[in-house]
Amino acid sequence: MKAFVASGLLLLIFGMWRCSGIEPVSMECDYFTFRVIAKRALFYPDDLIGPDELLLGASCPVTSIRPDELEFYYDIHSCGTFIQHAFDGTIVNTWLTYMPRNISIYAELQLQCVIPRISQDELDNKQSSDECVGESESIDVGNLDFHPPPQCWFLVLKRYCIICGHFHFPNNWLIPYHGWKDESFQRLWPSLFHR
């Protein structure tokens, strides 16, 4: 009965969060680092999440705490991130793990950050003939204007159910989560997923 009440409470919290219109989590990435910023009022406006309740991946703690936000700033290859290379860009997959203090269940928020690939045509169009550097001129590498392109982020909520031992999506809690679309992504707990 307690598990049923707790799962209903999480469903209510996730429903309120999705309908609030607030951007609760944002993710920025480039080819070397990524940053995730989560609102401390992630699920309910009056209930702030503590830094010990939210982890990046399975075990990476918060790197910066502000009154209204928790920030994670890590190397692109840490915290269990999975990198996919596509023809039009690079996709960085990671997740936030929310483990509340007083409840024995936890939730995972999957995140994706897309780094679009810049084509050679786009690079050629940025440099005009009067910007070319002659042989006698030197280039100050510190002043090169190279910024990572704008990123996109996607948020997929899922819940781990202690009763059945599977992950579920919030739009239909009865359908279990069957893992990432790319089966080469190996998690720390592969036995928890349906195969």
Swiss-Prot record:
Oocyte-specific. Keywords: Glycoprotein, Secreted, Signal. The keyword 4Fe-4S does not apply. It comes from the Eukaryota. InterPro entries: PLAC1_fam. Its main location: secreted. Residues 1-21 form the signal peptide. It is found in: Secreted. Glycans are attached at N102. GO terms for cellular component: extracellular region. Belongs to the PLAC1 family. This is Oocyte-secreted protein 3. It comes from Mus musculus (Mouse). The gene is Oosp3.
